[in-house]
Amino acid sequence: MLGGYDEKCVAILENLHQKINYRLLGLTNWSSETFHTAKKMYPFLDLFKGIVVSGDEKIKKPDPRLYQILIDRYGIQPGKSIFIDDTKINVEIAEDLGFQTIHFLSANQLQEELQKLGLM
């Protein structure tokens, strides 16, 4: 079952989307069915240029193979990319793969971290 969403997080997403040089990509552990329902419920998901869905790939985070699918599919250079996730192990795997990372705790904390990086 899908719940609500944090409007401040959506505002951050919209702000990043408006920045010309930022390509937003997603990596989710949703099932295929949940993702398709979410796409209908949450129009802000259209701000992502692409999303890798674990249900489609039959692999879940924190399996590094799922991250590699994201990297390969979208030609990501991890050292020039920021990975944001609310689960610590997922952030640690991304760090191991060379990503800059932010462990999401709250919308305010995320905004502060992005400001420190000069992204907001």
Identify what each model region corresponds to.
Residues 78-114:
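Acidic, Mg2+-coordinating phosphoryl-transfer loop and its flanking beta/alpha structural elements
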Residues 30-33, 57-58, 88-89:
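Short, solvent-exposed loop/turn segments at secondary-structure junctions
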Residues 60-88:
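Conserved Lys-Pro-Asp/Glu-containing loop-to-beta segment of HAD-superfamily phosphomonoesterases
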Residues 35-42:
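Distinct, well-ordered alpha-helical segments
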Residues 50-58:
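His/Asp/Glu-enriched short active-site or ligand-binding loop at hydrolase and phosphoryl-transfer sites
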Residues 1-25, 64, 107:
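Short, acidic loop-to-helix structural element flanking the phosphoryl-transfer center
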Residues 46-50, 78-81:
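Short acidic capping loops at alpha-helix termini that bridge into adjacent secondary structure
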